[in-house]
Structure formats: structure tokens, C-alpha cells
């Protein structure tokens, strides 16, 4: 029998609420475990419960305490481990407890800030008030100047969301799924229109804050601002693989949000099967590579000048899992290649598979002084195997037959993986058994 959330030991609360927060991708982890930190123990370890890594608006990587205020929730979203009907142990922090935990972790140099989200209790406004109270105490009572990322609730009043933005460095609202049809099926309490309206309100406050700061810079003897006037950006998360939405629909929604509300980032989170799942959910998670391809396509939309329709034509609404999106586009549009790297404009160089924005900048700078060769590209650490079929250099021109060959796609496909025998998984096996298996005797 579970004990009351209010009477629970603080350490146990942290275990439960840090674990419950891991499903939110809006606070991105580096994705890699540091050497000797995998067990979360030892001096200097940042792999303990509730600690994740994210990036600040100025590009710094910071360690954050990532927790929920509570995992109790009024909503019954089918894909969520913390849904109302889920049989999980519930816990709840008070605002004072979260503020003190943040300070304790910060003083011990475990973290540089806080990522705080919450299940919905009583009402959206009540929950939002509790989340804001944590940030208020940190900023006004304890004079905390570390990084704060607050997960806001679209159903909360705009006044409360505005108040959250005055305390936080970044705020985010999860859109969850790309269409209202999917929300009606899997998260009936959520409304896409409400979410977008809240995002537009945040964008307006960010614009007003930037304008005020610009005006303040023109005043010589202005008082120093010790905390952000308003959050410097917002982000969101979409769950991938919980419904039948195509990659085209997901990316069209992301592209719309980038353009309309100027999101800093859309996070794509592959659906993870949960205990006691709804019959409306898939049995298996989507391939992990699908999430990776969506991030690659997202990058092309934001920084390389691609449109969703170019990456995903109507006849093929899902990304190729075997090839990265830029390479897949190039193979569908071979008529625009080869591209002369010594003459092509920047926008065309960005579209060459294997060339990123950094290498394109180097090429543009270097070709002012001499015609570039493959050796020059190699010195720039360009992947020659990937770019050669698509470029013309001073000493290289690809064979048209190769560029037009149906076999070119095969050239870029990953090779077959060697299966490994894991003898550690067979405790009964002896060294002699292993030797016989390797020699083909069994």
C-alpha cells in the first residue's frame, strides 16, 4: 500500500519525481554517460537521480535538476505514465522543498539550474501557481541567479503564464501530438488551439521584453537588471510513434510553430511503451532512428533552407530510415548535381550531402584565394566518400554514369552488422563451450 504523498521521505519523493520527469524531452540530455559516472555515485558524478544536461540561450551546456512538482494528474492521456488511471506510486513536493533541493544541489556544484514540470492537480491554474511559487522563492527569497526552465500549462490563465516567464530563463508548453484528431483520441483533455494561443501569448511577451531591453540600452544610467525581464525563448515537445501521424505531418506542425511563434526548439520524443497500456497505443516503440531522422530534418528546415515538401513529397510522407534526409533529397533530385564548389552560391552548397554550415563557410572563405581541390576538402575534414558523387572540384568531376546509376543509393547504405555472441548472457556456458561455438562445433 502506497503512503501519503505528503508523509513520504524527501529522498523517496526525489526518486519518484525525478524518474517521472525523464519522459519529458524538452530538457535535452547529452545522451552519453560520462566515464565512471554511470552508477550516479562518487565525487563529481552528474549521473545521479534528477540531473540532466541542457543548453542555455547562449549555448552553454548546463547540468539541471529535472523533477516534477507532483506526478499526480487529473488528465488521463493514454501515452503518459503519470495519467490519472495509471497504477503508479504518487508523490508531491511542496514549493519550499523544491526550492531547497535546488539550492542544496547548486551549493554542492551538482547543478547549475532547475527544470520543473508537474502533473495537473486541482486545476491548471492551481498547479501553475505552485510551479511559479518555486521560481519566485528561488529568485526573490534566495536570490538564485541560476538557470530556470519552467514547463507551463496551456490551460492556465495567460496572466499566470506571463508571471512564469518573468522568473524563468526559458519556458515551454508541450504540444504532445501534431493534430487535434490525435489529441482527441489519446489526450482528450488537451486542445491544440489552446496550446497555440498560449504559445502566441508567450511570443508576444518575449517580443515586448526584447523591445524594452533595446530601449533600455539607450539609457546611460539605467539600473542593472539582475534577472530576466521575460524568458528568452520557448520550446515544445512532440511524441512520435504513439499515433499514426506521418513524419510529414509532424514536420509541418514543427515548421508552422517555428515560423509563427519562433520556437527555439521542437523536441521529438519516441513513444515508450508503459505499464498497463491502453489498447489505443502501439505495442512496440518506433525505431529509435526515426527520432534521429526527425531531428536531422528539423535541422535542415531551420538552418539549411529546406522546405518540408522538399524533404517529404506527398507520395512519400515518411523519412527514409536508411539515409539521412539531405542525402535522400539529393538522390531524388540528381538533376541539380554535380555542383561546382568553386562557383556555387552558399544556398546550393548547403544542399550538398556531407557539407555542413561550418564547412560551407570555410569553402566560401578559401575559394576567394584559389580553386579548391579534393585535398583542400580533406584538410577541412569533409567526408569525401559522401560528397564526391555530387561535386565538381578543381581536380575532380564525377562520372555522370555514377551519378545517374540506380546503384548509387546502395553505395551509401550502411553495411550489414556483424552479430556478436554474448557469452556473459549465458551463465551456464563454460569457456570450453565458447571455444566450441566459435569453431563451429555446436
Would you name each region that the model predicts?
Residues 64, 77, 116, 173, ...:
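Conserved, mostly hydrophobic/aromatic
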Residues 339-366, 370-389:
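Helix-hairpin-helix
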Residues 101-117, 297:
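Short Fe-S-cluster ligation motifs
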Residues 67-96:
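Canonical Radical SAM [4Fe-4S] cluster-binding loop centered on the CxxxCxxC motif
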Residues 1-72, 383-384, 389-392, 396-442:
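Flexible, acidic/Gly-rich N-terminal and inter-domain linker regions that tether
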Residues 279-350, 386-433, 437, 441-442:
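Long, highly charged, low-complexity intrinsically disordered interaction regions
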Residues 65-68, 96-107:
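Short, charged beta->alpha transition segments
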Residues 99, 122-311:
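Conserved AdoMet/S-adenosylmethionine-binding subsite of the radical SAM
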Amino acid at each position: 500500500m502506497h503512503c501519503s504523498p505528503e508523509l513520504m521521505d524527501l529522498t523517496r519523493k526525489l526518486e519518484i519525481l525525478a524518474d517521472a520527469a525523464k519522459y519529458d524531452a524538452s530538457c535535452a540530455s547529452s545522451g552519453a554517460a560520462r566515464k565512471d559516472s554511470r552508477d550516479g555515485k562518487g565525487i563529481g558524478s552528474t549521473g545521479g537521480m534528477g540531473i540532466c544536461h541542457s543548453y542555455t540561450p547562449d549555448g552553454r551546456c548546463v547540468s539541471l535538476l529535472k523533477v516534477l512538482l507532483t506526478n499526480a494528474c487529473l488528465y488521463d492521456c493514454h501515452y503518459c505514465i503519470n495519467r490519472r488511471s495509471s497504477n503508479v506510486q504518487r508523490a508531491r513536493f511542496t514549493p519550499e522543498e523544491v526550492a531547497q533541493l535546488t539550492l542544496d544541489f547548486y551549493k554542492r556544484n551538482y547543478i547549475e539550474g532547475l527544470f520543473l514540470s508537474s502533473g495537473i492537480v486541482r486545476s491548471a491554474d492551481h498547479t501553475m501557481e505552485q510551479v511559479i511559487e518555486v521560481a519566485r522563492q528561488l529568485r526573490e527569497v534566495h536570490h538564485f541567479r541560476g538557470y530556470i526552465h519552467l514547463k507551463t500549462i496551456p490551460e492556465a490563465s495567460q496572466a499566470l503564464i506571463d508571471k512564469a516567464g518573468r522568473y524563468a530563463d526559458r519556458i515551454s508548453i508541450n504540444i504532445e501530438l501534431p493534430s487535434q484528431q490525435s489529441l482527441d483520441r489519446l489526450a482528450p483533455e488537451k486542445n491544440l488551439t489552446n496550446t497555440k494561443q498560449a504559445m502566441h501569448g508567450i511570443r508576444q511577451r518575449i517580443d515586448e521584453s526584447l523591445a524594452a531591453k533595446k530601449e533600455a540600452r539607450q539609457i546611460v544610467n539605467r539600473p542593472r537588471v539582475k534577472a530576466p525581464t521575460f524568458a528568452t525563448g520557448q520550446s515544445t515537445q512532440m511524441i512520435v510513434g504513439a499515433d499514426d501521424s506521418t513524419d510529414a505531418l509532424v514536420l509541418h506542425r514543427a515548421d508552422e510553430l517555428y515560423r509563427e511563434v519562433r520556437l527555439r526548439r521542437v523536441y521529438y520524443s519516441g513513444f515508450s511503451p508503459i505499464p498497463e497500456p491502453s489498447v489505443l497505443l502501439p505495442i512496440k516503440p518506433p525505431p529509435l532512428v526515426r527520432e534521429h531522422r526527425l531531428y536531422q530534418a528539423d535541422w535542415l528546415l531551420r538552418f539549411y533552407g529546406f522546405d518540408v515538401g522538399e524533404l517529404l513529397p506527398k507520395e512519400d510522407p515518411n523519412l527514409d530510415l536508411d539515409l539521412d534526409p539531405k542525402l535522400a533529397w539529393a538522390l531524388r533530385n540528381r538533376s541539380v548535381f554535380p555542383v561546382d564548389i568553386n562557383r556555387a552560391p552558399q544556398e546550393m552548397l548547403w544542399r550538398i550531402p556531407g557539407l555542413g554550415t561550418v564547412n560551407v563557410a570555410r569553402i566560401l572563405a578559401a575559394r576567394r584565394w584559389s580553386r579548391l581541390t579534393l585535398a583542400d576538402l580533406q584538410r577541412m575534414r569533409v567526408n569525401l566518400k559522401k560528397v564526391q558523387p555530387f561535386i565538381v572540384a578543381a581536380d575532380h568531376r564525377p562520372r555522370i554514369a555514377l551519378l545517374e546509376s540506380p546503384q548509387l543509393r546502395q553505395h551509401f547504405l550502411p553495411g550489414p552488422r556483424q552479430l556478436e555472441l554474448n557469452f556473459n548472457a549465458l551463465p551456464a556456458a563454460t569457456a570450453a563451450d565458447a571455444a566450441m561455438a566459435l569453431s563451429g562445433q555446436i
